[in-house]
Amino acid sequence: MAMIELEFGRQNFHPLKKKSPLLLKLIAVVFAVLLFCEFLIYYLAIFQCNWPEVKTTASDGEQATREPVLKAMFLADTHLLGEVLGHWPDKLRREWQMERAFQTALWLLQPEVVFILGDIFDEGKWSTPEAWVNDVERFQKMFRHPSHVQLKVVAGNHDIGFHYEMNTYKVERFEKVFSSERLFSWKGINFVMVNSVALNGDGCGICSETEAELIEVSHRLNCSREQARGSSRCGPGPLLPMSAPVLLQHYPLYRRSDANCSGEDAAPPEERDIPFKENYDVLSREASQKLLRWFQPRLVLSGHTHSACEVHHGGRVPELSVPSFSWRNRNNPSFIMGSITPTDYTLSKCYLPREDVVLIIYCGMVGFLVVLTLTHFGLLASPFLAGLNLLRKRKTR
């Protein structure tokens, strides 16, 4: 009886023994692909990005001084999904992509300041107080950063609503989390952060208040320039750095369309000639002229279109539209790296992993697992064994 039981146990052991190596192989393949697609691919992509070189010596009469360089990252249109239109697979996939990309960029590139150019959230324009708190907590987890790294945010139309949806409650709710500062100065560099949604120009309360704040910032910047030239019209007070500011906003300055935009992350060719609507796709011509006149910026960075574009306003003021940071809006998201001094700057673009490449790798993994399983159970000849059999047949001829 004992011999029969032992023999029965041996017979059952062989199938288990046969299945165990297959299971281990399948687990190993899945683990390796997950590790690469969800972690290592971000290091592989961002490791290829380097801070652009910028001239760091400024001539002051006969003396040359070395200027400090600020390393700044610019990204836009993260569009964290909300409870109404968002569904959990989309949230999980796209938010994990942005979190891994951002955390990898922080670790590899070590920026000093990060600017996000609006549309942080997808449903801030209508989210309930409870949903808003949940969205903010997710944002703070995804875009967590060391205390020595500054994170600055400007409002977009999806954060506080388009002009006709915007109200004081939504603006104050946003500014309570992300600050209401309009001017940020560091290392002798001035950044003006504009609530471009409130530049409709129709005299609404929020619009008037926003314009008054921007005029005050413009006055302070101009006073610093004049006092540096020996003028005393502005009276006593702390001086701002006298360098021309960098303008940061969500809406681009006025342009007719993306017809003159080019590059792999520009708008698709069939969309480039579509005319833009003022105060919807871009700022109005009037608001754009005001900003250029008030601040005389040396550089403008904006978001909103989800695509890249470089234009020059008046033939001298460059504006760069920053593509979306999320796979939800682009197959090839990216961000801008800037090496900036008080008198000069250089920008470069860092591309994140392409979503279609990741999907192709996963599809390839599924196909490989199917072939491996069929081969293991003898339902499909192993390519290696098939090759050996072919060689044997040739030798016997």
Curated annotation (Swiss-Prot):
Record-linked CDD domains: MPP_MPPE1 (cd08165)
**Which Gene Ontology BP terms does the record give?**
endoplasmic reticulum to Golgi vesicle-mediated transport; GPI anchor biosynthetic process
Keyword annotations? ER-Golgi transport, GPI-anchor biosynthesis, Hydrolase, Manganese, Membrane, Metal-binding, Transmembrane, Transmembrane helix, Transport
* InterPro entries listed in its UniProt record: Calcineurin-like_PHP_ApaH, Metallo-depent_PP-like, MPP_MPPE1, PGAP5/Cdc1/Ted1
Q: Where are the transmembrane segments?
A: 27-47, 357-377
Coiled coil (UniProt feature): none
Instruction: Write down the membrane topology.
Output: Multi-pass membrane protein
**SUPFAM superfamilies (UniProt xref):** Metallo-dependent phosphatases
The highest taxon in the source lineage is: Eukaryota
Which sites bind a divalent metal cation 1?
119, 157, 250, 304
The GO terms this record gives for MF are:
GPI-mannose ethanolamine phosphate phosphodiesterase activity; manganese ion binding
Q: What is the top EC class of this enzyme, as a single word?
A: hydrolase
| Localization (cell) | Endoplasmic reticulum-Golgi intermediate compartment membrane
The UniProt entry's GO CC annotations, sorted and at most eight, read: endoplasmic reticulum exit site; endoplasmic reticulum-Golgi intermediate compartment membrane; Golgi apparatus
Pfam families this protein is in?
Metallophos
Q: What is its EC number?
A: 3.1.-.-
Keyword check for Transmembrane, yes or no. Answer: yes
Task: Give a yes or no for keyword Membrane in this entry.
Answer: yes
Q: Which residues bind a divalent metal cation 2?
A: 77, 119, 250, 306
User: For this protein, what does the record note about how its cofactor is bound?
Assistant: Binds 2 manganese ions per subunit.
Q: Which Gene3D superfamilies match?
A: 3.60.21.10
Task: Cite the domain annotation text.
Answer: The di-lysine motif (KxKxx) acts as an endoplasmic reticulum retrieval signal.
Q: What functional role does this protein have? A: Metallophosphoesterase that catalyzes the removal of a side-chain ethanolamine-phosphate (EtNP) from the second mannose of the GPI-anchor protein intermediate. Participates in the glycan remodeling steps of GPI-anchor maturation to allow an efficient transport of GPI-anchor proteins from the endoplasmic reticulum to the Golgi.
PANTHER family reported for this sequence: METALLO PHOSPHOESTERASE RELATED, METALLOPHOSPHOESTERASE 1
Family that this chain belongs to: Belongs to the metallophosphoesterase superfamily. MPPE1 family.
Name of this chain's protein: Metallophosphoesterase 1
Which species?
Answer: Pongo abelii
**Gene name as annotated:** MPPE1
